[in-house]
Amino acid sequence: MFSVKWGELYFNVVMEGGKAVKSYFSTYPSFSSSDSEYARQLERYFSGERVEVRIPYRLKASSFTRRVLEEVSRIPYGMVRMYSDIAKALNTSPRAVGQAVKRNPLPVIIPCHRVVGKKEIGGYTVSCSDIDGKSLKKRLLRLEGVF
C-alpha cells in the first residue's frame, strides 16, 4: 500500500499479493510513500511525463464490469473514447458502460477518466466528498494533453 502526492491531492493504492485491488484520490495520504517501481511510475505520470501506468491488478467485479474495464484499459495515454464506442464494441448500451465504469475500483490504473460522452465530458466517481469528480476528470485529461 502506498500514497503518491499530486498537487494538493494524494493518489492511494491498496495492494494485495503484489497486485492492486483498489485505488482512490484523497486530500490526505492514506499510506506512506514508497520507492517501489509502481510508485515511481505514478510519480512520473502525475508529474506530466507520458507514462502508460502498468501496475498489475486483480479485479473484484462482475463479468460484465470486468469486460467493460478491460476495454477501457486499452485506451492509450492522451486519447479518449466515447461511452457509445465502448458499448458498440461490447454489444451493449452506453448507459450500461457508464454504470460499469462508475464501479471501477482502480481509477488511473484502469483509465476510466479517458471515457467521455458525445456532448460532454461525463462524470467521474470519487470516494472523497472534498473532491469534485468532474473537475478531477478534466484535470487528468489536461495532464495527458487531451484539452
UniProtKB/Swiss-Prot annotation:
Domain of life: Archaea
GO cellular component terms given for this protein: cytoplasm
Keywords in alphabetical order: Cytoplasm, DNA damage, DNA repair, Methyltransferase, Transferase
Catalytic activity: a 6-O-methyl-2'-deoxyguanosine in DNA + L-cysteinyl-[protein] = S-methyl-L-cysteinyl-[protein] + a 2'-deoxyguanosine in DNA; a 4-O-methyl-thymidine in DNA + L-cysteinyl-[protein] = a thymidine in DNA + S-methyl-L-cysteinyl-[protein]
EC number per UniProt: 2.1.1.63
Active-site residues per Swiss-Prot or TrEMBL entry: 112
Cell location: Cytoplasm
Pfam families found in the cross-reference section: DNA_binding_1
Single GO MF annotation: methylated-DNA-[protein]-cysteine S-methyltransferase activity
Biological process (GO), any one: DNA alkylation repair
Function noted in UniProt: Involved in the cellular defense against the biological effects of O6-methylguanine (O6-MeG) and O4-methylthymine (O4-MeT) in DNA. Repairs the methylated nucleobase in DNA by stoichiometrically transferring the methyl group to a cysteine residue in the enzyme. This is a suicide reaction: the enzyme is irreversibly inactivated.
Additional note from the record: This enzyme catalyzes only one turnover and therefore is not strictly catalytic. According to one definition, an enzyme is a biocatalyst that acts repeatedly and over many reaction cycles.
Record-linked PANTHER family: METHYLATED-DNA--PROTEIN-CYSTEINE METHYLTRANSFERASE
Family indicated by similarity: Belongs to the MGMT family.
Stated name of the protein: Methylated-DNA--protein-cysteine methyltransferase
Lineage: Archaea, Methanobacteriati, Methanobacteriota, Archaeoglobi, Archaeoglobales
